Amino acid sequence: MSDSPIKYRLIKKEKHTGARLGEIITPHGTFPTPMFMPVGTQATVKTQSPEELKEMGSGIILSNTYHLWLRPGDELIARAGGLHKFMNWDQPILTDSGGFQVYSLADSRNITEEGVTFKNHLNGSKMFLSPEKAISIQNNLGSDIMMSFDECPQFYQPYDYVKKSIERTSRWAERGLKAHRRPHDQGLFGIVQGAGFEDLRRQSAHDLVSMDFSGYSIGGLAVGETHEEMNAVLDFTTQLLPENKPRYLMGVGAPDSLIDGVIRGVDMFDCVLPTRIARNGTCMTSQGRLVVKNAQFAEDFTPLDPECDCYTCNNYTRAYLRHLLKADETFGIRLTSYHNLYFLLNLMKQVRQAIMDDNLLEFREYFVEKYGYNKSGRNF
């Protein structure tokens, strides 16, 4: 895939770590890396408008193939002119393959060489997703970056199961490449699996790199393993991937995990965490996690985070946010979601600057101490 529509340009390597400052060029524009990608599951980042996402510095967003296939349907989106036009977003979009959603429906799925049979979570009907179908759906959606269909084995699965799984994922990746109808305007990433087994990660990476994908995702992490186990897997996995292609760590959004991923050479991250916790009034701030719904903030007329210059923090107080959330007002969720997304996007901006200044390890130490990870154990 040497004429890939997705290009990675390395700007600088950090002197003391594996961190890389760069940019990714796509048919819908260029974004700087390392980058956090807000998740727009149903072709919308919950409660946020496209204009707000641009305003907060989101260079790319993610949408879910599985959910859009079921509703409203990929063919309908194709008739609308593709996902960008359908949702009025003119910047890059990444779509997942649907594999993780199917994996999370563990009770109702059956995996064979052909693909996966499972129950539609909306109406209980029987569905079948194959590597070819996953690619076809994404071709209809028209995302800039697509994912190969993979199986995401649990981190603590037995070795023999994981070995069979990664070998099947490699065969599925090859089938997906052959089925790809739009290689000139949609890049396709391969997904490295292997749970916590170094030799299986090596085998998976070797298989996929030989297929020359536009970029490589690291899957099967943030699924219940410890923070230390994830870092250990990243330590050896990123080194197996080409220097001239993007590296994407799937499903990771806790602030320390983002920094630790960057230190180990990852360029892209996504997670529903910032919007999911915002709906419960949990906010990430420069001083750590804050649950603004708590009674102690009822008469707190200070900004959510005095060090943050986002729209929420510039205009509203903790007391007002608490009132909105307690009254079940959607505006409260909009404001906390905006802040959390801005916080992670701004964190990545600070990380990019730290790479430029060759002081990423010092920045990590400063951030972790201030955020309170050292005081209360690890907590997003």
Curated annotation (Swiss-Prot):
The keyword Zinc applies. One of its GO terms (molecular function) is metal ion binding. Its EC number is 2.4.2.29. Its cofactor is Zn(2+). Residues 251-257, 275-279 are annotated as: RNA binding. Binds 1 zinc ion per subunit. Belongs to the queuine tRNA-ribosyltransferase family. Homodimer. Within each dimer, one monomer is responsible for RNA recognition and catalysis, while the other monomer binds to the replacement base PreQ1. PANTHER family: QUEUINE TRNA-RIBOSYLTRANSFERASE (PTHR46499:SF1). Catalyzes the base-exchange of a guanine (G) residue with the queuine precursor 7-aminomethyl-7-deazaguanine (PreQ1) at position 34 (anticodon wobble position) in tRNAs with GU(N) anticodons (tRNA-Asp, -Asn, -His and -Tyr). Catalysis occurs through a double-displacement mechanism. The nucleophile active site attacks the C1' of nucleotide 34 to detach the guanine base from the RNA, forming a covalent enzyme-RNA intermediate. The proton acceptor active site deprotonates the incoming PreQ1, allowing a nucleophilic attack on the C1' of the ribose to form the product. This is Queuine tRNA-ribosyltransferase.
